[in-house]
Amino acid sequence: MNVYDDVLDATVVSHSLATHFTTSDYEELLVVRTNILSVYRPTRDGKLYLTDEFKFHGLITDIGLIPQKDSPLSCLLLCTGVAKISILKFNTLTNSIDTLSLHYYEGKFKGKSLVELAKISTLRMDPGSSCALLFNNDIIAFLPFHVNKNDDDEEEEDEDENIDDSELIHSMNQKSQGTNTFNKRKRTKLGDKFTAPSVVLVASELYEGAKNIIDIQFLKNFTKPTIALLYQPKLVWAGNTTISKLPTQYVILTLNIQPAESATKIESTTIAFVKELPWDLHTIVPVSNGAIIVGTNELAFLDNTGVLQSTVLLNSFADKELQKTKIINNSSLEIMFREKNTTSIWIPSSKSKNGGSNNDETLLLMDLKSNIYYIQMEAEGRLLIKFDIFKLPIVNDLLKENSNPKCITRLNATNSNKNMDLFIGFGSGNALVLRLNNLKSTIETREAHNPSSGTNSLMDINDDDDEEMDDLYADEAPENGLTTNDSKGTVETVQPFDIELLSSLRNVGPITSLTVGKVSSIDDVVKGLPNPNKNEYSLVATSGNGSGSHLTVIQTSVQPEIELALKFISITQIWNLKIKGRDRYLITTDSTKSRSDIYESDNNFKLHKGGRLRRDATTVYISMFGEEKRIIQVTTNHLYLYDTHFRRLTTIKFDYEVIHVSVMDPYILVTVSRGDIKIFELEEKNKRKLLKVDLPEILNEMVITSGLILKSNMCNEFLIGLSKSQEEQLLFTFVTADNQIIFFTKDHNDRIFQLNGVDQLNESLYISTYQLGDEIVPDPSIKQVMINKLGHDNKEEYLTILTFGGEIYQYRKLPQRRSRFYRNVTRNDLAITGAPDNAYAKGVSSIERIMHYFPDYNGYSVIFVTGSVPYILIKEDDSTPKIFKFGNIPLVSVTPWSERSVMCVDDIKNARVYTLTTDNMYYGNKLPLKQIKISNVLDDYKTLQKLVYHERAQLFLVSYCKRVPYEALGEDGEKVIGYDENVPHAEGFQSGILLINPKSWKVIDKIDFPKNSVVNEMRSSMIQINSKTKRKREYIIAGVANATTEDTPPTGAFHIYDVIEVVPEPGKPDTNYKLKEIFQEEVSGTVSTVCEVSGRFMISQSQKVLVRDIQEDNSVIPVAFLDIPVFVTDSKSFGNLLIIGDAMQGFQFIGFDAEPYRMISLGRSMSKFQTMSLEFLVNGGDMYFAATDADRNVHVLKYAPDEPNSLSGQRLVHCSSFTLHSTNSCMMLLPRNEEFGSPQVPSFQNVGGQVDGSVFKIVPLSEEKYRRLYVIQQQIIDRELQLGGLNPRMERLANDFYQMGHSMRPMLDFNVIRRFCGLAIDRRKSIAQKAGRHAHFEAWRDIINIEFSMRSLCQGK
């Protein structure tokens, strides 16, 4: 009984497209991160501003586009799961996504396939938008779209037109294809359906003999849908190429699709067939007059008639025995385009001003290391006269930290391909927007300065029919200027190639290791006062690969920079008065003593005794007024107007206590406890009097709880003469006791407006003329509202609502309709901060929560929320607004300070000036992220692997791994017989351990291991060093594997280190610790994991695990061992209990006994899966286990000896299996925060990191909580519309292990449950009633407990 929740959203960009999806005003960029679809507005200077974002309940595996009928917008095809396609359309009225149709093919695919289906199917789109194609292995599904009957005639007329408005983006990583945005065939409705019936075929039904499909693509410039199939009738790999040297075949088929109401018929006609192609070809990239087939070792060009015109050899492994083709031998370049790590983009020729073609067709390829290659293609008719490849000479290191490109999309397409903006998503490294300048000039200058040495064309054309082509190609042979067989000279371009970084999207994936340690709370005292982040621990992860690898600090709260600290004796509220742009006066008040004081900010905070400020009363509000020439002070019963020397000018007395004040020059709005409001205007001429503003008469019938003066254009369409104006108007805004928000202008003429639906917190709100209800029931829940702009460079208007229960709701103003606000419930990722019905009284009882808006907090427009747990609302330009905890101490008051800072007062009367930390910080995910670079120019440690935290020294240790040239050495240390120095060699590894001080994040000590060694595991463990006294000491244990040749047995070693304190180096106070080796031992077999158990430590040696004990003389002896079926992938301990994961056979549950020494097998998993990581999952007194496998599943098993089918616990009971959207790489056990009461036994939770940059947690639940939340989840799934028509149950639970688990006890998905908090109030209560009489109250408490479970990191250990 557990619940899954995302701690961090995915950050790796897997797919992207440029299209008109939500608006026709500009071309948008659609970006996919695992299950999140983001829509960005690209600017001309390459900035990306988020406009919409949607979170789906399934893994998005591919996307495509088709045009809408009678609309400039496009529909989105979303491929999810194994084989599902959702067709989506953006609804501009509701600002959400509508699902037009859902097509499920998995069942049909399984019925026709003779082998197990691949986990992901591949989507292909016809350039003419007549159909879509989805294939999995040899099974192909066609989804036709309705077209006009006159299409054929229209296409014949348009046959000669150039399709240069199109653009093809092709990702070889998942063979994912975006689509062009043009529509050559006009679609129309057949009946009322959007699509025709689908057809599912085996590849051999299209072309006899087609099997083992490698790739399928639609070709271009055909009047009918035409596909190219690349396949191998007999599978071949590098080891058996001598038996079948050229096994790959290629066929071009034209499809005749005949849609009908009942069934669709597809007939195929063979255009061309090509055989005897190299075995390593893997991807088809269509171009204007044919296709480029990309292989690991070759590039081949086949035209649309199926003629293999030319082949480029990329490396020395390429097959030089190809027949009937022109061979360009560039094997000395040693380029490799691996199938899953190569991406391409094809851009057709642009049009010149006179309508002709510029002949600048462009094809770019990127390899695993992010090198960009230009494919040179020049043709005369269908004859290719130039075909070559060269690496773009990028002189800067913009792509040094990026690897594994996933997708490429062109932005801001212009009439020329000379310069282009490209958006590139990477598996490791930030997604980048790059500007390629002078691309054409680079190519031209390169051709003009080619060296004329040797020939690089190998001709072997024996067919008499190709003699003419032979002559043509022979003339072109000397034109190629790349490195040749006879000359090793290189070519340098005359014109430098300029690449410019315009913007980026933050990526922290892949996460390979997680630990918990002190980062923001290392210093107990800052500026003489306690650290505001005291007792706070952070999650720290290793992120990225290669030179881009770094540490990512996942902060549980915002860590501000402290500029100034002050200590006060009597203070509860604080205000800063600026005069002429300088901080002049600091006003404090103490409500407990009814006292106010003035301090001179520019005079070392000396107490100011002059002036007539009311000091013997509690100040409710004070600020500058009247163009900074006056000061306004409001006490509990009076309003005072002063000049800048605090000479009193006007006094106004109130009969009731003032509870709220809002000021905007030249108006002041006062709300009193009776529910009345007063509005005053400053006399314009002398600025010595306050004039009362007339209020609408209908306000006399209302009870007002708070008021606000703001500027907005949301009511313009209701104001005479302003319906089309964008100018912001001054609006007096009020919240009534029946939770209505009303507006009126100064010249109101008794006409006021209301925001409909806000009392129920509906998903969509709209402004209309106010209608007085028949009966008003005062039940105030809305405490405060704000309408202001949030963001960094691109600020957007939001309505923010704070309730008396501490909840924060946020609505965004519709860009299409200024009078409407909406809340995206499908992406409502605002943190939960409170609960209605007094369900979370603890959060709002001690210190009042009040929102404060700051238009410039170090460049960001933010909202602070004071309280016992303070919050900050902040928005990055490329993300939705987020709510974070601000520090780890209460805040009672906050005021602007200096230009970009704030001054805050805590609950013990300390004041601090905070500035937002922006260096290497990112506030666009669910928690603040800080990037820490360990490598530098001198020391590049490449990939950071295992990370641990040394609690006693408060230091981090991380292992690194860099690639080095591999040397095949025998057991004697000499090079093996047959070693050839002249061929490309494999790469080996070299590892080491770094000791890092988090105060400076500098490496203060390191240990390097020999070449061909890898640190597989590293742990910080409390090891018993004296068996009599049971004294323990914290040691670092590292397990190492040595990479040797195939003929030598594997070996490894384990090393034990202590972190000792030393005298620091002069001028380097952070170098006060060093690593000291305690013990090391070489062992037979690789050491894949180490683990502490009951004061000893366990290591794995190939198929054995041994527990070792450290003696007093620091020697180590083995005391117990156990055999493992295949290979240990992970191991964890809990006291004297162990779980050991196997690479093929699940995992075992082991008990360790020290008297006598032995390892006892308590149970094992019966389900056989490839264990990736595992952890104990403790729920009360029950012992559960969480294990993840290579198929993206997390399994929960239980040790239950009382279960009848468990054989007294020997078989672990399989409770549930839950599908993840990415591969899990690490998992750890953390204490769990209990927000309501303290449990009798400690509670825990699991936290795991994933390859896509996301982090998740698994939280155990009690039976009562589980049942309540299970009902709510079921109701939301059944009664609420799901994005893309996806079923959250199916996406998470439909896996191969579903039948083994308890069908009535599946793992819950908090992503579904938290939608409960975003529903309208009436729908929320309706759903809660299904779970019980008081379920609404209890459900909120359950949700808060899950939401706040990670706050255990803020309470120390």
From Swiss-Prot:
Pfam families the record matches: Beta-prop_RSE1_1st, CPSF_A
One biological process term in Gene Ontology: mRNA processing
Stated name of the protein: Protein CFT1
Molecular function terms from GO: RNA binding
Family recorded in the similarity comment: Belongs to the CFT1 family.
InterPro entries on file: Beta-prop_RSE1/DDB1/CPSF1_1st, Cleavage/polyA-sp_fac_asu_C, RSE1/DDB1/CFT1/CPSF1, WD40/YVTN_repeat-like_dom_sf
Known partners and oligomeric status: Component of the cleavage and polyadenylation factor (CPF) complex, which is composed of at least PTI1, SYC1, SSU72, GLC7, MPE1, REF2, PFS2, PTA1, YSH1/BRR5, SWD2, CFT2/YDH1, YTH1, CFT1/YHH1, FIP1 and PAP1. Interacts with the phosphorylated CTD domain of RPB1/RNA polymerase II.
Localization (cell): Nucleus
Keywords: mRNA processing, Nucleus, RNA-binding
Biased composition (Polar residues): 450-459
UniProt keyword annotation of Nucleotide-binding present: no
Miscellaneous comment: Present with 639 molecules/cell in log phase SD medium.
Function of the molecule: RNA-binding component of the cleavage and polyadenylation factor (CPF) complex, which plays a key role in polyadenylation-dependent pre-mRNA 3'-end formation and cooperates with cleavage factors including the CFIA complex and NAB4/CFIB. Involved in poly(A) site recognition. May be involved in coupling transcription termination and mRNA 3'-end formation.
Membrane-spanning parts: none
Superkingdom classification of source: Eukaryota
GO cellular component labels: mitochondrion; mRNA cleavage and polyadenylation specificity factor complex; nucleus
Annotated stretches, region: Disordered: 445-465
